[in-house]
């Protein structure tokens, strides 16, 4: 996958939960922008739902599906990979906002990174199995984000 590959067909659903400060997150995530970031990381057509949630929902999903009782930045629920990728990407707004602040990034830049990261997961990339796969995924994220004009997220 190279950054100059044409954008793939993406059926995107973008959802926001109700939580304090949701307007900031809506402003950072206009539909066209989210569509561009995700499409850029796709190797094939996709149907993807992106849901921006509060800490309570993020923690509940992480606990129920990963058995980790805390809110994490992003969860990827991938259902099919071929011929069309179908997935739900759930991002926890308070965690994303805190991490962006701690890492000295804009909210937009951190969301771009996490959406590219989650889209790669939805296509089978993994960084938790072994170091080689982790380095491959990280290098691809850096390349894709650079082509979207974002700095190295690491």
From Swiss-Prot:
This is Endoribonuclease YbeY. Its cofactor is Zn(2+). The gene is ybeY. Its EC number is 3.1.-.-. Its main location: cytoplasm. The keyword Transmembrane helix does not apply. Signal peptide: none annotated. Belongs to the endoribonuclease YbeY family. One of its GO terms (molecular function) is RNA endonuclease activity. It is found in: Cytoplasm. Zn(2+) binds at residues 117, 121, 127. It comes from the Bacteria. One of its GO terms (cellular component) is cytoplasm. It is an enzyme of class 3 (hydrolase). Binds 1 zinc ion. Single strand-specific metallo-endoribonuclease involved in late-stage 70S ribosome quality control and in maturation of the 3' terminus of the 16S rRNA. One of its GO terms (biological process) is rRNA processing.
